[in-house]
């Protein structure tokens, strides 16, 4: 699950395989983990976290979303949920979701009103759901995000153009 590559002597580089002049060796076999040797996340760690997240959100259309508890033996009472609406990458509205009282493997549909913001023509809008721990655990502090999902709310609104005055001359040569 984690890389097993020690630091090279007098270097900030982590070594593996033939870096220690040890032949034969297993090549990069010891650096195929999800976590780097210094216990920082690799890109694979974020992918594994996403795949194993305990809450899935599915867009159903017309402002409705299906929340599913992917846990097999526990409810979601230890989590709280929030959603944010982003306009061109900036949060313009956020709110808490109602209590996540979903038993193992259960689902429920929620509705989020689409009129909470005034949409600007030409802007792009997304909704992001976040699910975080209510309390500290042995492995992470309260507030740690265990699941998230993002959906495009709509294509960016078309800008409104006013017809200009005057004329255009086309000269073909």
Locations of the language-model features?
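Extended substrate-binding grooves/exosites of carbohydrate-active enzymes
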Residues: 1-62, 72-77, 82-91
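Short hydrophobic alpha-helix segments
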Residues: 7-8, 95-97, 149
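Conserved, mostly hydrophobic/aromatic
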Residues: 48, 67, 129
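Extracellular ectodomain segments of secreted/surface proteins
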Residues: 50-60, 152, 156-159, 163-164
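Hydrophobic residues positioned within well-ordered beta-strands of beta-sheet architectures
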Residues: 63-65, 81, 110, 127, ...
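Short beta-strand elements
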Residues: 136-162
């Amino acid at each position: 699950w984690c890389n097993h590559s020690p630091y090279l002597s007098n270097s900030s580089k982590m070594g593996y395989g033939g870096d220690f002049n040890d032949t034969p060796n297993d090549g990069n076999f010891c650096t195929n983990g999800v976590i780097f040797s210094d216990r920082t996340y690799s890109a694979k760690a974020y992918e594994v976290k996403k795949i194993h997240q305990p809450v899935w959100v599915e867009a159903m259309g017309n402002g409705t979303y299906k929340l599913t508890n992917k846990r097999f033996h526990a409810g979601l009472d230890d989590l709280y949920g929030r959603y944010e609406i982003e306009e061109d990458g900036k949060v313009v509205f956020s709110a808490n979701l109602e209590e996540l009282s979903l038993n193992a493997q259960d689902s429920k549909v929620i509705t989020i009103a689409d009129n909470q913001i005034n949409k600007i023509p030409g802007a792009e809008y997304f909704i992001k759901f976040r699910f975080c721990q209510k309390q500290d655990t042995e492995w992470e502090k309260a507030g740690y995000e265990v699941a998230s999902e993002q959906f495009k709310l709509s294509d960016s609104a078309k800008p409104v153009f006013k017809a200009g005055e005057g004329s255009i001359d086309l000269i073909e040569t």
